[in-house]
Amino acid sequence: MLLALALQVASTPPAPRDGFAESAFAHFSRVQTLTHSSETVDVAIVYAPYSTAPPAYMMRLTRRRFQQPDAIFWADSRSCPAMRPVLDAMRALASPQPQVPGIDPYGDIILDGTGYRLTTRARFANRQDGDLVYSSNIGTPLAAWVDGSLGALARCWSATAPVS
């Protein structure tokens, strides 16, 4: 697990520098280290001043392949009905429990080279805000959610950025 995490961090290049990633409230990714490929999704809310309409969301997918230029795709919740269920499922995602070496038994080591990561805003039960960073390998709720989300959003992506 630690080896896979180290490989994931080492192989994940920075996001495009267009300001979108910085305004996003969530980022999730799947990194396949053995093939030097990754898919990273940044999620941002689209604010409409003085609007009573439900919030809209925008996502950017950055697809990286070995020795190829990055491919950027966009999706918008106003034209992608799959987006809201993906975000609802993110809110319901099961979190792992902290593990203390020497107290807790060690888990299995998986060296398949696929890493999953979610970084998002979070809130504690006492309504205090924080950040959540969750990474794992295959066979976890995070892996299932990322794979399922990428599949659910597959028809939504466009090379043209939506109008905010």
Q: What does each of the following model-derived ranges do?
A:
Residues 1-9:
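Sec-dependent N-terminal signal peptides
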Residues 9-164:
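Function-determining sites in protein domains
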